[in-house]
Structure formats: C-alpha cells, structure tokens
A protein has these predicted regions:
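N-terminal loops that bind phosphate or other acidic moieties
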Residues: 1-232
Length: 232
C-alpha cells in the first residue's frame, strides 16, 4: 500500500494474560522504529507530525501501562474503549489486574512495562515522541493510546514533552490526568472514543486557523484605530 512503511517486528503481541506481550529487546526495537520514522520524516522537511494508531483492544494494553506508570488501580484508568458493555468492561479490568499481578512490571523501567503489558503501537509511538525531541519536530498527541505513549516517552526522555502538542481529551478516564502530568492542555474536548489520528487532524486545522489569524488579521495600526487608553 502506497505510503505504508513496513517495520513489522512480529505478527502481533502475545496474550499478556498468560505471558509477556513481547520480549524486552522487541520493545526496544519497536521504540527505535518510532524514532527512525520521525528521523525520516524530518529529513524530508516535515516540522509537525500527528501521532495516531489503529487497532482493536489496544485501550486494554494502554490502560495496563497507565495503571503501572500512574500507580493507580486498573478500574480507575480503564474505560469502555469503542463501547464495551458493563460486563465486558468488568472482564477488561480483570484481565488488566491479572496481567499486572502476573508480570509485576517495573514502573521505573519503561521497556519492562511495555514488554510485559504493552503493545507495539505504544512502543513505536513512544519512539516517535522521543524522535520529535531528537530531530526538532512538533509532535501532536492524539487520543488515549497516544497520550500513554507520550507519558512513556517523557519517562524515558525527560523534557521531550517540550516538543508535544495536545489535541483533544479522550473520553477514556485518565487521559486528562496524563496530559496534566505532561504539562499539556488540550483545546478540544469532544468526548471522542477513538484515536487513529482523528483529534490530531482536527488540531492541525485549529493550528492553521490560529496561524492565519496571527499572520493575516489586521492590527489597529493597519486600520487606523487608536490603541486602547487607560481610563483614569
């Protein structure tokens, strides 16, 4: 498919309920993929990059990673994803709890966390955010999964959040908390339950509008209007 870059590491992750999602080395390799992709885009002249992901079930792994990094209970960081029933949500929370209990990921080792209860999407996005800092590209945070990856990147590479721009607050419960930790405030709050770069693309439109206003809107001097004067 034109435009798709094949960086496959393996055919999916393992079932984290029974074994580690991937090996430690595979997690590192996936992070490097993200860094390399941003390097390639930067060399082509791109200055701003929208992150995003595509998948089913990856809010489960993202909630697991968030639970570990934020040191919060699974039920406090887990939402309905694409629209789970209450029963399915309970099952999702239970899977996350059991997976964390089984693998005991070390929150001080991001590669350990991702390899045990994460996914390749989270790992590659983590690398992309780090790549943004390395190569001077502004990185737009999309939804919940993207924000979890941004948090992983900040843990691995402190201050890389200086190159991040928040787009929207996902409906998933702890997205706002993650953005706050990153020092970001998302201007869009639309209760969106999807990632896939959707909110990020809307944010690009908002940025275009802001730049247009800043660069092209008439000033008081342009239209011969006196500046405000302090009333005494």
């Amino acid at each position: 498919v034109d435009g798709v870059v094949n960086k496959k590491i393996s055919y999916g992750t393992k079932n984290m309920l029974h074994e580690k999602a991937m090996t430690y080395e595979q997690a590192k390799e996936a992070v490097q993929v993200g860094i390399d992709c941003v390097k390639e885009l930067s060399e082509k002249g791109y200055k701003i990059i929208v992150t995003g992901e595509m998948g089913i079930g990856n809010t489960t792994t993202s909630s697991a990673v968030a639970s570990v990094l934020l040191d919060r209970k699974a039920e406090d960081v887990t939402g309905r994803g694409a629209g789970l029933t209450s029963g399915a949500l309970e099952r999702k929370i239970e899977v996350i709890k059991k997976s964390i209990e089984l693998h005991k990921p070390d929150k001080n080792d991001i590669f350990d966390v991702i390899s045990k209860v994460g996914g390749y999407d989270i790992a590659a996005l983590t690398g992309a955010f780090i790549g943004g800092a390395m190569y001077g590209a502004a990185m737009v945070i999309d939804g919940f999964i993207s924000s979890v990856a941004a948090l992983c990147a900040e843990k691995l590479c402190p201050k890389c959040s200086d190159f991040m721009i928040a787009s929207h607050v996902s409906k998933e419960s702890c997205t706002a908390d993650i953005l706050k930790i990153l020092g970001k405030k998302a201007p869009i709050n639309a209760d969106m339950c999807l990632g896939e770069g959707t909110g990020g693309m809307v944010m690009l439109t908002a940025l275009d509008t802001a730049l247009c206003v800043y660069n092209e809107m008439s000033t008081f001097d342009d239209i011969n209007v006196e500046s405000y004067k302090e009333l005494k």
